[in-house]
Amino acid sequence: MIKLLTYLIGLVDLAPHLYDNLKKMINCVIIHKGYQPYLKYNLEISSKNNYVYLIGDDSLEFLGSKFKNVEFINIQKFENSKNLIHLKEQFKNFNSNSYDFEWFCFARVFMIHDFLEQYELENVFHIDSDNVLLTNISNLEFLKKNAYLIPPNQEAYRMSGSIHSGLIDKSFCEKFINLYKDIYVNKSKFHLIEDKVNYHTEQNIPGGICDMTLYYLLQREEILDTQNLFFPIKDKSGSEFIFMNNFSNSEGPNGKNSFQFEKDQISIINRNKIFDTISEKEYNLCNIHFQGGAKKKLNRLFKYKISY
């Protein structure tokens, strides 16, 4: 918290007119276990324009002193809570991925809830450890209290939303937890995932139910009023920005093949823009999501290929 206050004071010194807006500043959070070099490179880039809370295990503690706008919080502060342990006891894995991997994805939201409560924050912008921010999130004009990516294309039981770039408040967490309980504990809403469970099981198709399924259901069932960050968003000056779903996939707001694509990745234009080939519009880029095998591209040299 001391590092955050220092960061805020620095902003005032650099730009006194920002003082009235300090309380509206949106902090970022990453939850990760086990050191990976790409996480270090992410923090170096993302923390240039954003204050980042890093919730992780002992292997990540050194990163909190390496970057001035990064504050490390030991994950044990949240992971060992009685409530989290109780929720884990109710979890059943309906996915071809491992139990531990899928549970941790769910647990992130439970931990964010407790983090917001303990640190008395109104909201936080969650980013995955392989998702780099190129802009100051606080400069964006969010239209709703909660905002994340929900692909327009939901065919073949995709049922997917993503908070790899997600504005989250306590209400989001509480409604996610309630939906989790209705599906996994009292099973009053198990029917919402039953067809998808059967689809993957009977057709022997990899994947299944995950935290992303519940993000999708929160929106589809109108449990939560959300802004879909799959679509363009403006900053305070009126410039249009867009969030990337996956660096290795050209899917965007206008379909599966929206963005200009070269070889195996979305084309980055002028170091921080992308081009929608369907709408024929160029957008400022909010993020780059190095999902899956693309993580190897987030290396010590990548920062020289972009502007942030």
Residue positions per predicted region:
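N-terminal anchoring/stem segment of glycosyltransferases
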Residues: 2-94, 117, 170-171, 291-308
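A structural signal for short, well-ordered beta-strand segments and their strand-loop junctions
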Residues: 53-56, 124-128, 149-150, 225-232
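Short catalytic/ligand-binding loop motif for oxyanion handling, primarily in non-cytosolic enzymes
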Residues: 62-64, 133-136, 141, 158-160
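Surface-exposed cleft-lining segments at the edges of enzyme active sites
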Residues: 95-101
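GT-A fold catalytic core of metal-dependent nucleotide-sugar glycosyltransferases
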Residues: 104-150
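Catalytic core and acceptor-binding pocket of nucleotide-sugar-dependent glycosyltransferases
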Residues: 177-308
